Amino acid sequence: MKLSRIALATMLVAAPLAAANAGVTVTPLLLGYTFQDSQHNNGGKDGNLTNGPELQDDLFVGAALGIELTPWLGFEAEYNQVKGDVDGASAGAEYKQKQINGNFYVTSDLITKNYDSKIKPYVLLGAGHYKYDFDGVNRGTRGTSEEGTLGNAGVGAFWRLNDALSLRTEARATYNADEEFWNYTALAGLNVVLGGHLKPAAPVVEVAPVEPTPVTPQPQELTEDLNMELRVFFDTNKSNIKDQYKPEIAKVAEKLSEYPNATARIEGHTDNTGPRKLNERLSLARANSVKSALVNEYNVDASRLSTQGFAWDQPIADNKTKEGRAMNRRVFATITGSRTVVVQPGQEAAAPAAAQ
């Protein structure tokens, strides 16, 4: 039962390593020959395993799963068994020896640093758990099985066939700590590496900084929007433009020249004095006065200007007061448009025209 628990624990540890598939080693079959300790098993030592009869040397069979911890250090979980005869006991007497081992090995790469060499000698140290089962052997009160702790020490070599396959040979000594004797095993197997052997990280090479190629700034095309307003106020029953508003009309003409696709919507308004028909004509006349000034004095294309009269329908002040009526006798124009300008490197784009 104890051996089974150790085997299960070993498998649980090894499974994630195999799943990682990087530097994982598998030895699916280890074959060898185990030489049993003759002094311990020939009846010459009190309390030996067989109580007299001698365990015979026999075939060693095993398998191992491991991982390369560094390019020169590895760990393996191993299971093996030996089944042989027992001389001096009843006819057909035999024993079966089982082991679960955890072994570390250090290759010659620790010293040589020759990670691509085809032959890699190694030394091995480890420990494990053993169990002997006996059939046809009279062991008195000791029963038909024996188990305990062991230690392993060995030397060997990996003979690389390619980066994934190596032949493996090893000579190993196993010490039975409970019974105080040594067994010796010569073994060989085929070692498979999943994901390739570990190698030291490549040295960091400092790369000289690359000076960026100077970038010559290029001219940029930008769109400038025009949003402008014009307000002109009139005397009662008049549609002529007072001199004080002519500079404002000139500014509108200038912007219409700067923005060739700009248009103006010109709206005329009146107070509520007089009949409606008269105020409708008067409000339109006031809008047309501003349009005529732009067309006749500044050569603005008439198709870019639209006019409309609203009479007293859209007052902005109280028509009951003199001041309010003066505010309502007006023209209100909105000028909108856009243009594409080319801005040279280092030149700031002009701010959009603000509403006036």
From Swiss-Prot:
Name this polypeptide is given: Outer membrane protein Omp38
Biological process annotations from GO: monoatomic ion transport
Keywords: Apoptosis, Cell outer membrane, Ion transport, Membrane, Porin, Signal, Transmembrane, Transmembrane beta strand, Transport
CDD domains membership: OmpA_C-like
Superkingdom of source: Bacteria
Species per Swiss-Prot/TrEMBL record: Acinetobacter baumannii (strain ATCC 17978 / DSM 105126 / CIP 53.77 / LMG 1025 / NCDC KC755 / 5377)
Assembly: Homotrimer.
Pfam families, A to Z: OMP_b-brl (PF13505), OmpA (PF00691)
Family (UniProt): Belongs to the outer membrane OOP (TC 1.B.6) superfamily.
